[in-house]
Amino acid sequence: KDEIIDAGIDGKKGGGKKDTQDAGESNKGKEKDKDINAGSKGSGVPRLQKITKKMNLPMVKGSMVLDLDHLIEYKPDQTKLFNTRATDAQFATWYEGVKAEYELSDDQMGVIMNPFMVWCIENGTSPDINGVWVMMDGDEQVEYPLKPMVENAKPTLRQIMHHFSDAAEAYIEMRCASGPYMPRYGLLRNLRDKNLARYAFDFYEVNAKTSDRAREAVSGEKAAALSNVTNKLFGLDGNVATISEDTERHTARDVNQNMHTLLGMGAPQ
């Protein structure tokens, strides 16, 4: 009779037990993994809050009026907050107004904005400018009226042109790289250092990245430009007339029209 062979048992008696013992002996040499205690704490470095509620903060009826979480995350672009720069909405209104009066497309306006920025670098952005501005088409001068540029600029043309400050600075650097170049604004201010040519335009926007020497140069340029300027609040009122009657009577012997005779004395020398 054929014997029934179990495939799970070693052919030799006791073979399966021996394998189990060998596996146990091989595991004795290994260290048991340590369990990690989820409740344990390391020596963490304390972090201080940048703005705490213990500061003297503005309060109304015992409630703080600031949202500290929002204040910590509020880090806007500094130049966007300057009141010396036109807002984005004011700049867009100026752009659309100029485009409508010149009757140009957006692509054509892109060509116009380049030479107008260069013209302002050379001639400034004074509110008193009038007439025409000029761009070059090869060797030919092409004239455009300044009226749309100035009248649509709110609050002022200089505040509008502050949006072009970085582009103008990069343009001057490009011109200086190809040869000696100093904007006319710098020539009028007698700026002698060619390395400061990139700051020699009147709509340069001073920011946190501007070096101390450059800020000094910009301040000196503005002071020199405004040294002889006098602004009068009121001009001559042409609607005011003298209504009083002058009843003074003078003779030929009087000293002058405002002084009677001095009884033989001559006029004071």
Curated annotation (Swiss-Prot):
PTM text: Genome polyprotein of potyviruses undergoes post-translational proteolytic processing by the main proteinase NIa-pro resulting in the production of at least ten individual proteins. The P1 proteinase and the HC-pro cleave only their respective C-termini autocatalytically. 6K1 is essential for proper proteolytic separation of P3 from CI.
Gene Ontology cellular component terms for the protein in this record: viral capsid
Pfam family, one: Poty_coat
InterPro entries with a match to the protein in the record: Poty_coat
Region (Disordered): 1-45
Regions of compositional bias (Basic and acidic residues) in chain numbering: 9-36
UniProt keywords, alphabetically: Capsid protein, Virion
Family statement drawn from the similarity comment of this UniProt entry: Belongs to the potyviridae genome polyprotein family.
Record protein name field: Genome polyprotein
Classification lineage: Viruses, Riboviria, Orthornavirae, Pisuviricota, Stelpaviricetes
